[in-house]
């Protein structure tokens, strides 16, 4: 019976380990970049608030600009219908 020290690692096994390590390191690097970007976005919103802008409205506009025009129009129609039903318009 061979001991673990005497067993030579197969090249395919070493390749898989190296590949896994590279993937994990890439994910960690991207997570750090994501945190940095989130901090930058938060700073921009703080700057906007300091200049008197309504941050909630800015966030709504940013979210709406990401939507497809048809999807946004449909959502606005539904919102308007609900507001009319509740006597808000």
From Swiss-Prot:
InterPro entries: GapR-like, GapR-like_DNA-bd. It comes from the Bacteria. GO terms for molecular function: DNA binding. Belongs to the UPF0335 family. This is UPF0335 protein RPC_3979.
């Amino acid at each position: 019976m061979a001991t673990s020290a005497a067993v030579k690692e197969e090249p395919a096994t070493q390749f898989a380990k190296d590949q896994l390590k590279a993937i994990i390191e890439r994910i960690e690097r991207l997570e750090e970049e994501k945190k940095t970007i989130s901090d930058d976005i938060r700073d921009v919103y703080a700057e906007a608030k300091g200049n008197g802008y309504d941050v909630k409205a800015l966030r709504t506009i940013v979210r709406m600009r990401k939507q497809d025009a048809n999807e946004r129009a449909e959502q606005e129609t539904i919102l308007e219908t609900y507001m009319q039903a509740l006597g808000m318009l």
